[in-house]
Curated annotation (Swiss-Prot):
Superkingdom to which the source organism belongs: Bacteria
Class of this enzyme: lyase
Species the sequence originates in: Chlorobium luteolum (strain DSM 273 / BCRC 81028 / 2530)
Pathway: Isoprenoid biosynthesis; isopentenyl diphosphate biosynthesis via DXP pathway; isopentenyl diphosphate from 1-deoxy-D-xylulose 5-phosphate: step 4/6
Cofactor note: Binds 1 divalent metal cation per subunit.
Example of a GO biological process term: terpenoid biosynthetic process
Metal-binding among keywords: yes
Function: Involved in the biosynthesis of isopentenyl diphosphate (IPP) and dimethylallyl diphosphate (DMAPP), two major building blocks of isoprenoid compounds. Catalyzes the conversion of 4-diphosphocytidyl-2-C-methyl-D-erythritol 2-phosphate (CDP-ME2P) to 2-C-methyl-D-erythritol 2,4-cyclodiphosphate (ME-CPP) with a corresponding release of cytidine 5-monophosphate (CMP).
Protein name as annotated: 2-C-methyl-D-erythritol 2,4-cyclodiphosphate synthase
Catalytic activity: 4-CDP-2-C-methyl-D-erythritol 2-phosphate = 2-C-methyl-D-erythritol 2,4-cyclic diphosphate + CMP
Family that this chain belongs to: Belongs to the IspF family.
Length: 157
């Protein structure tokens, strides 16, 4: 078994959709980034790539490439899942934590879990998504951005 960790951060911006875990969440502002800026899926992707020692999302999906401009991060996570399989691994578990003050994401967690599981072709019971605030501290507390942390376990096929 191998363990990976992923962390991602994006600032909020006016005129952007808030996409988290592949879910379009109603919000007056969204996250800024080269892709759809899905902070949760980026952290999960990095955790999986790290566990397999396959680099990170910046290596596989550079923000200098027009190919990935505004791309749906579920497409990226599916690619990571296929890359793991190609290299002889399968996902055992994904545990992810979202850090943001608002909006509350509890109503969307089940959909996020299903999206991650579907992208990785695993059972939803193997995916955990949680959220917390930053207690009004720092850039997250000031609602300037959001972050996500993810830990995963993979094993050889």
């Amino acid at each position: 078994m191998r363990i990976g960790i992923g962390i991602d951060v994006h600032p909020f911006a006016e005129g952007r959709k808030l996409i988290v875990g592949g879910v379009d969440i109603p919000s007056p502002k969204g996250l800024e980034g080269h892709s759809d800026a899905d902070v949760l899926l980026h952290a999960v992707s990095d955790a999986l790539l790290g566990a397999a020692a396959l680099g990170d999302i910046g290596l596989h999906f550079p923000n200098t490439s027009a190919e990935y401009k505004d791309i749906d991060s579920m497409i990226l996570l599916k690619h990571v899942g296929r890359l793991l399989t190609k290299n002889g691994y399968r996902t055992v578990n994904v545990d992810a934590m979202l850090l943001l003050e608002a909006p509350k994401i509890a109503p969307y967690v089940a959909d996020m879990r299903r999206n991650i599981a579907r992208c990785l072709d695993i059972d939803t019971s193997l995916v955990s998504v949680k959220a917390t605030t930053n207690e009004k501290l720092g850039y997250i507390g000031r609602e300037e951005g959001a972050a996500a942390h993810a830990v995963c376990i993979i094993e050889t096929l």
